[in-house]
Amino acid sequence: MIGWLIYRKEDAIVNYSYIQWFKQEAEKQELCLKLVYDEQLTIQMETNGSSLKIEGHIVDKPDFVIIRKMGTLLQKQFEAMKITTFNNAETAEICNHKVLTYLEMQKIKVSMMPTVFISTVTPPEKPPFNYPFILKSATGHGGTNVYWIDNEDKWKQILKTAITADYIAQSCKDIQTGKDVRVFVIGQQIIAAVLRTNDNDFRANFKLGGKASLFELAPTMEATIKKIINHFNFGMVGIDFLLHNNGNLVFNEIEDVVGSRILSATSNINLLEKYITHIKQTMETVRK
């Protein structure tokens, strides 16, 4: 079977080693994985179907695609051509907009922070919560465009200089700041959980200088995670939780294009080996 691994060029440069690891794990399991740059890919839609072009040349359809970029239109176009995508369009669409994600969590009664959608096009006259609270881009990831709002001046300044239209505001009452738990999930399986902490920032992201260690999930925590997993059709994702002052998990977000740096730094788990196994098993089922 032949699959495409799709990256933007600039991201592929940064993730060169990760891409080579991806391809090696695929080869071990007799899958051919080809790196395709998003900028060189064209999907031409016509009355009777679509064709794929790389650098202007028509190419054969792959059996599956692994999309390592934000967005959903690419997934939707591939799926219209009956090409299996990882993650699929539904997962990508919901997980890449926090309002959509929270609506799904609300459906299945997963504990979350009080959350308000904020449009910078028509911002509210007054802040939605008492200070301090969190304001973050509804489409951001990796800890970017996340702000600690502790006074009126900061509230007004962020809204005035916002680089995206959609934000969410969240009450951080009774939440442990500078600490969160990332749960790595492949398909229907919980692979591992990692506790991230940061003594110098309210954000716990590893890339922002946080520390990490493996985290043992209590049975009640696993039950919460299983509830989320059963609601979706995941390929590979990272589900992030904050910690309530009482120690319980509070849902934060789902990372669609999740990496494995933090898991590699804290364990010997080969995440990509497991992901390729999942993809191969999924494709064998699809082709029956």
Positions of the model-derived regions?
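Active-site nucleotide/adenylate-binding loops and adjacent lid/helix of ATP-dependent enzymes
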Residues: 2-9, 14, 19-20, 24, ...
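Conserved N-proximal alpha/beta basic substrate-recognition cap immediately N-terminal to
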Residues: 10-114
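Short glycine-enriched loops at secondary-structure junctions
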Residues: 70-72, 91, 196, 242-247
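Protein kinase-like catalytic core scaffold
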Residues: 133, 191-192, 237, 250-253
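Phosphate-binding site of ATP-dependent enzymes
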Residues: 147-232
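A short beta-strand motif that forms the metal-chelation/ATP-contact edge
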Residues: 183-185, 247-260
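A long amphipathic alpha-helix within ATP-dependent nucleotide-binding catalytic cores
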Residues: 202-251, 262, 273-288
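Short, flexible active-site recognition loops that position polar ligands and cofactors
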Residues: 260-270
